[in-house]
Amino acid sequence: MHDHLTKLYPPEQARSLQEGLQNLATDFAAAHPDLAGQARGLTADQSEVLLIAYGDQVKPRSGSPLKGLLEFMNQRLSGLTGLHLLPHFPYSSDDGFSVIDYRRVDPALGTWEDVKALGERYNLMFDAVINHISAESHWNKEFLAGNDRGYLLQSDPGMDHSLVIRPRTHPLLTTVETPRGPKHVWTTFSADQIDLDYSNPDLLYEIADVLLLYAENGARYLRLDAVGFLWKELGTTCMHLPQTHELVKLLRTFFDIAAPGVCLVPEINGTYEENAPYFGNGSDEAQMVYNFPLPPLVGPSFHTGDD
């Protein structure tokens, strides 16, 4: 971890965070020997078939939607080995990708016990929506009340943001009122989705703890949503920066200690040249990359015989 952290933080912060993350990972491994004993690296192969679905994709006659989804998969969808369970947390917009609380299951869908039951039968992929959090989250409410933990990214609108890659057309910065006066938070995707500040080591520790909760509740794949945007630095595109790759490598090292079988799957939504670097040297970064162009190309490839 040391090599990655020293590329992200000043020496004292890096040492402190390394100790914290090391303890977090080893404590988790001791408490979950079944996860800690898994083989390191990618274990999926061509036989792995995942359904992608929201938790309420199936409406059962009784019981929670998540229980209904498990029953439907067991009875109607033979041959599946896994489930990409789309965001199943309380949310405020963007079809679940504006998470209000990372640590709760949306009660309209069910409970963590329902999620665990799915994980006992299928390999689960969770969405780790860790670039941004909902404006309705506790973190933002604290910030608006004057308790700034440094988790939310702010920027001076007077600075030059012209190089920043914009995936959407709304303003990059959103002005909010706080007891300390107006503040300008970074909102890559919408005013309801406030970007997190990974230059704060306390935030990274918190996110690592959240990801362990996901592993504890059955996640075998962590789809790192919008991962290319994680680290921002003015004067750059703020996209796929070297620091972002160090963050992914750090998470890989962290999970190699805590739960080696958990597979990191960055969601890039880019070209091959942007996707491939997230594999690192083949063993030190992501095990897979979530590649949007690939699925629509599979059908024509079968039809034409041309890959």
Please identify what each model-predicted range represents.
Residues 301:
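A mobile, often basic/glycine-rich helix-loop segment
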Residues 304-307:
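Short, intrinsically disordered, charge-balanced linker/junction segments flanking boundaries
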Residues 2-205, 212, 216, 227-297:
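Acidic/aromatic-lined carbohydrate-recognition and catalytic surfaces
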